[in-house]
Amino acid sequence: MNHEPKKECFKTSVGGQALMEGIMMRGPEHICCAVRKPDGTIETKIEDTPKHGIWAKIPLVRGAISMIESLITGYRYMMYSAQVSMGDEYDAEEEESAFEKWVGDHLGKKAEDIMLAAAAVIGGLFAILLFTVLPTVLVGGLNHLVPLNRWAKVVLEAVLKVAIFLTYMAAISRMKEIHRVFEYHGAEHKTIACYEAGDPLTVENVRKYTRFHPRCGTSFLILVVIVSVFLYSVLPWSSTSLRVVFKLLLLPLVMGISYELLKWCGRSDNIATRIIRQPGLWVQRLTVFEPDDSMIEVAIAAVTPVLPEDPEDGKW
């Protein structure tokens, strides 16, 4: 009986982000944002991919840089997609706050960069407060009521962190607008999987692939949660406020380790990497849903312009 050798699936660095009625895809040289307009047509916007020089090549350091850059870029394209998808209903002057108008009047072209950076900082601070500070404060408060030993506090803090993260993801996925974004998330994953398998990018081909992908932002976030649990377990509990300070100082290292694990799991397929990436695949059931064909069309429109002529140039 003949057995054909199993074809190794190509792993690409091309990836993206789901938006409001659209998708942003990022390749080695270009970024393309494709958004479904109210009239049913697809609008695309293509820009050069930002370069970060040597810093983007240093292990552990590149993880924090990638996270910050993704927050800023992602927010910018999310705002753009909201504007395009709303069409004539979007009123830039109405949406602009007094503060934004003041910044625009006084800083001109720098205003957008400042507002995007500020939005990214606010979003980052919210995530830090919710997933890093809150569990520690809750355990510290409980410890004043019911004295706990060190490992009881470590375990309880870990359980609270995971519970808060999963509850937050489950809650926002029930919002109608966010649920559609998560459906576009599925279209993004399916399209990348189709490309990596070497199939032509058609709706029929893309539709048959899984919506789950190991190299996903959700997988990175769950890795951050898991790595932080282990790394923070060695920190002292003598003072709740001091523990919070130590956790904040170690956060760039947590992101760096998580990013390197994601890179490793993306390149290798063995028992260890399958175990490490499995929690991320489980959590994707909360953040990635099956798309319809119109969403797949948008994903194809977004990824096609950013694919390198030589696939090796975009190898993971």
Model regions: which residues?
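Cytosolic-side membrane-entry/anchor segment at the start of a transmembrane helix
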Residues: 2-14, 18, 100-137, 141-145
